[in-house]
């Protein structure tokens, strides 16, 4: 059935939209057919290029001006995703143009098809769509009401119909904030309180009063930990951090990002709320009310800062961070962005960490600081003189150089941690290293089969969504932690380590160290992973053996419904800006007007004095 639907699903929109051109006369009608053909083809082409990296399709919020600016900044990455054979997508358009230009087809300028026949063509297109939808519903019931996965919509209904569906859903979401009221937050609060996991006395408050330093490992997947390429460790320093006696190292920790990728990871780590099913909450909901980590910690005397080697407008961070309650944001304007030190998305990691040192020293302790690295980002370009390990030899250039940029990141982090030790910050800080999202998408399955030495199927791809989550707490006995969890669980885990109970906060995640933590990892598309069974691409698998499970049990169905409910409730918080209606006891609302991240002249002078 699915193969048949893949063949017929483009027909309804092709007939309908081409039919619109028939309202025009002769030659003009043919020109409109070419224009419509080009537009439909371009939508398909743009989505294909987007899918090659994001493993997802374009949504209307992706076309938000701020997010489009992000795409513009991605220049080199986009070009790396385009293949010369892609011109074949436009072959039919070129043929139609040639037929018209060279006079092979000469439409009668005055001829016009009768309106009744045109309406008949349009009606046929609509009828074909509903027939398509009916067949799709037979194979996958409630296709348009229950799924979070855009892949299904495209597979069953076609690309253009998906874009229309997405536009309708996006319009609906825009009305939710206006219609929301204080009663809407109660359902969410009831849910989060029902799943609250009480802190583990063994860990609660063990990091109280200490600085918190997050090191964001860009595109870093868990399989890199202890991985050897040609007998050589790819990330020797991060491996040693993973094994440190004071590091809590989680080995079944998954990223849960959607289209927002890094921005989604930040949303979860800072708020314990999922990214949106469409687009990025950073760009579309950046002015919402939040109860984020920096805002919470401000009530306990913490200073806060973000360090990032790209400009503050990227992902709308300058707006979002003010609503999160960050006191400082050191973006690219604070760094020396010379040509030698800039690559891909911004400042290379080594100069980034080095130039961040004087700004760290300007913070009041205790502080909460996040360092967002950039070099280990698709398509993983690196100068030969900066590569200290040979590339892999899969024949896939992005996969091969991934190990070289990961090594560069490893060396950068090592230098930074050495600095923290020399200044005494290391012994008075909780240091967290985490991977934000995958580095290698499932479009590189062939290369990953060679890297991992096993068939990289849907099940293995889901397992590869593990990313590092390592928490180094001075004086606390570390070790490998095997409980299942994800980015949504980071905030309650960290707050409990700092001695702050999360009982009254609206958070979708739970403390990974709590005995009450439920080991269920929802993904943004409605799939999930648990220690016993997992739902991946609409199919169940035995999590231990990787074997498909043919029959859905009541327990599986209940888990699937729980995941769906949790994602919907999280979406309602962001879409309706529901936190404006609820303030936990002891939390002071963030006033975004208090923050200004523009670089002052004194910042330059202070940096110059410090580095002399």
Explain the meaning of each model-derived region.
Residues 1-167:
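Transmembrane and membrane-interface helices of multi-pass
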Residues 63-69, 180-183, 485, 507, ...:
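Short coil/turn linker and secondary-structure boundary residues
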Residues 7-17, 21, 28, 32-35, ...:
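Amphipathic, alpha-helical segments enriched in basic
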Residues 192-612:
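Solvent-exposed soluble domains appended to multi-pass membrane proteins
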Residues 48-62, 80-83, 178-184, 262, ...:
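A diffuse structural propensity rather than consistent per-protein peaks
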Residues 132-209:
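Membrane-interface segments at or immediately adjacent to transmembrane helices
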């Amino acid at each position: 059935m699915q193969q048949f639907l893949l063949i017929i699903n483009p027909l309804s929109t092709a007939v309908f939209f081409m039919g619109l051109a028939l309202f025009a006369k002769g030659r003009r009608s043919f020109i409109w057919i070419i224009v419509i053909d080009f537009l439909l083809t371009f939508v398909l082409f743009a989505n294909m290029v987007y899918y090659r990296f994001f493993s997802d399709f374009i949504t209307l919020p992706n076309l938000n001006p701020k997010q489009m600016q992000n795409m513009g900044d991605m220049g080199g990455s986009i070009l790396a995703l385009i293949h010369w054979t892609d011109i074949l997508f436009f072959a039919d358009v070129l043929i139609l143009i040639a037929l018209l230009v060279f006079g092979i087809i000469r439409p009668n300028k005055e001829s016009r098809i009768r309106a009744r026949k045109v309406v008949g063509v349009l009606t046929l297109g609509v009828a074909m769509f509903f027939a398509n939808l009916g067949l799709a519903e037979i194979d996958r019931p409630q296709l348009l009401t229950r799924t979070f996965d855009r892949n299904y919509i495209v597979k069953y209904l076609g690309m253009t119909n998906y874009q229309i569906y997405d536009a309708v859903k996006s319009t609906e979401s825009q009305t939710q904030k206006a219609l929301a009221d204080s009663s809407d937050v109660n359902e969410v609060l009831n849910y989060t309180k029902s799943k609250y996991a009480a802190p583990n006395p063994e860990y609660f408050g063990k990091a109280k009063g200490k600085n918190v330093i997050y090191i964001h490992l860009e595109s870093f997947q868990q399989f890199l930990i202890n991985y050897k390429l040609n007998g050589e460790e790819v990330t020797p320093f991060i491996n040693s951090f993973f094994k440190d006696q004071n590091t809590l190292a989680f080995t079944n920790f998954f990223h849960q990002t959607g289209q927002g990728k890094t921005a989604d990871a930040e949303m979860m780590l800072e708020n314990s709320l999922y990214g949106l099913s469409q687009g990025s909450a950073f760009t579309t909901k950046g002015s919402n009310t939040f109860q984020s980590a920096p805002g919470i910690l401000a009530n306990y005397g913490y200073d806060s800062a973000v360090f990032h080697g790209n400009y503050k407008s990227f992902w709308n961070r300058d707006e979002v961070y003010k609503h999160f309650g960050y006191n400082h944001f050191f973006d690219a304007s604070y760094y020396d962005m010379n040509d030698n030190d800039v690559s891909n998305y911004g400042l290379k990691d080594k100069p980034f960490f080095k130039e961040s040192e004087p700004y760290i020293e300007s913070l009041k302790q205790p502080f909460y600081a996040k360092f967002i690295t950039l070099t280990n980002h698709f398509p993983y370009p690196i100068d030969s003189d900066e590569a200290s390990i040979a590339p892999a030899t899969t024949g896939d250039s992005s996969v091969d150089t991934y190990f070289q940029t990961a090594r560069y990141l490893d060396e950068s982090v090592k230098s930074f941690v050495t600095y923290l030790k020399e200044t005494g910050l290391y012994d008075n800080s909780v240091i967290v290293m985490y991977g934000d999202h995958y580095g290698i998408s499932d479009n590189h399955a062939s290369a990953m089969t060679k890297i991992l030495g096993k068939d990289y199927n849907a099940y293995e791809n889901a397992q590869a969504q593990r990313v590092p989550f390592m928490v180094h707490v001075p004086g606390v006995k570390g070790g490998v932690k095997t409980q299942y969890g994800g980015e949504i669980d980071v905030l309650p885990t960290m707050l409990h380590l700092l001695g702050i109970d999360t009982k009254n906060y609206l958070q979708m995640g739970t403390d990974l160290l709590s005995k009450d933590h439920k080991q269920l990892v929802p993904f943004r598309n409605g799939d999930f992973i648990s220690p016993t069974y997992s739902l991946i691409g609409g199919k169940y698998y035995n999590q231990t053996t990787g074997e498909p499970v043919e029959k859905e049990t009541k327990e599986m169905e209940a888990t699937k419904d729980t995941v769906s409910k949790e994602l919907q409730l999280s979406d309602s918080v962001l879409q309706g800006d529901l936190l404006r209606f609820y303030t936990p006891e002891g939390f002071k609302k963030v006033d975004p007007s208090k923050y200004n991240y523009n670089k002052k002249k004194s910042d330059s002078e202070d940096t110059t004095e410090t580095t002399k």
